[in-house]
Amino acid sequence: MIIDTTEVQAINSFSRSESLKEGYGLIGMLVPIFTPVSGITIGVLVIVWLEREISAGIQQRIGPEYAGPLGILQALADGTKLLFKEDLLPSRGDIRLFSIGPSIAVISILLSYSVIPFGYRLVLADLSIGVFLWIAISSIAPIGLLMSGYGSNNKYSFSGGLRAAAQSISYEIPLTPCVLSISLLSNSSSTIDIVEAQSKYGFWGWNLWRQPIGFIVFIISSLAECERLPFDLPEAEEELVAGYQTEYSGIKFGLFYVASYLNLLVSSLFVTVLYLGGWNLSIPYIFIPELFGINKTGGVFGTTIGILITLAKAYLFLFIPITTRWTLPRMRMDQLLNLGWKFLLPISLGNLLLTTSSQLLSL
């Protein structure tokens, strides 16, 4: 039997090209996944470092300084430590609920990043119901916390899970009319359209000036959603040890830790998008685009500037929840619920009524 060498070479080249196509296809699938995940991870590490440095300054002490330059790698060292710690399971608890709870909390918050625009058209999912999708997704996280508390078979954990669910429901309801007011002003529920609607009048076109009452209610509700002081009732150390986290250790405890800061970053980014103009700088780029012929709303330069502006606004806003943590005392549970149902909800509904009336009169 005579083997044609040209046919063998053709078969080999074809198989090589097919394997290269498969490799490029796999890389093309992984890059869009790992790029936002890496960016979010770095963002969380920066938040942890900022909180430790600001907290150290408020308490007049030295913050982390040994792990990396200025202690910026301290959070990474803590995460590595938790990764190698023993993962203990409660002997009489529901292991499935106990294990699934932290994952649900983290995944639901990660999905919220899909509708956040970091620059001009730089968003994973530009949906017409973007802001309301975020509200719907954020409602899933308390279910994971309640599952964690129930699966632990511990009275402190279960009480913390119930508190987390009650707190989330109480403050998500006043938060929704604030978002609806912004949608009415922008004539859209898309996060891209909301940012572009604020770019018409520069700095004075921000929704912060058109919705000051809604802005305050949104901030308070966001802090309660993130379970930050003075709203950290589900994790009150003096009453519940650590709340729904009491029985957790190792990487599962680390997931709750990450979810807390992920939620804080999501809230800050949505404050930036809804009230602070998003990626718009609101002042001219000082002749740089005109000098080099760069488009302000597109291209590499415009996209990079938009990302930097969005992150700068979000991280500047983070000073409010960080300083609030070391300023205000923890509220009681009855005070927490009264604030949400008796004060914030009527105020947000009144603000929505005023916004609707003004929009109808302007037609």
UniProtKB/Swiss-Prot annotation:
Subunit-level organization: NDH is composed of at least 16 different subunits, 5 of which are encoded in the nucleus.
Q: Where in the cell is it found?
A: Plastid, Chloroplast thylakoid membrane
What GO CC terms are in its UniProt record?
chloroplast thylakoid membrane
Top-level taxonomic group: Eukaryota
> Sorted alphabetically, which Pfam families does this protein's record hold?
NADHdh (PF00146)
Q: Which gene encodes it?
A: ndhA
The UniProt record lists the EC number as 7.1.1.-
State if Transmembrane helix is listed as a keyword: yes
Class of this enzyme: translocase
The task this protein performs is described as:
NDH shuttles electrons from NAD(P)H:plastoquinone, via FMN and iron-sulfur (Fe-S) centers, to quinones in the photosynthetic chain and possibly in a chloroplast respiratory chain. The immediate electron acceptor for the enzyme in this species is believed to be plastoquinone. Couples the redox reaction to proton translocation, and thus conserves the redox energy in a proton gradient.
A biological process (GO) of this protein is: photosynthesis, light reaction
Q: Where does this protein chiefly localize?
A: plastid
Protein name per its UniProtKB record = NAD(P)H-quinone oxidoreductase subunit 1, chloroplastic
Q: Which GO terms describe its molecular function?
A: NADH dehydrogenase activity; oxidoreductase activity, acting on NAD(P)H, quinone or similar compound as acceptor; quinone binding
Checking InterPro entries in the record gives:
NADH_UbQ_OxRdtase_su1/FPO (IPR001694), NADH_UbQ_OxRdtase_su1_CS (IPR018086)
Q: How does it sit in the membrane?
A: Multi-pass membrane protein
Q: Which UniProt keywords apply?
A: Chloroplast, Membrane, NAD, NADP, Plastid, Plastoquinone, Quinone, Thylakoid, Translocase, Transmembrane, Transmembrane helix
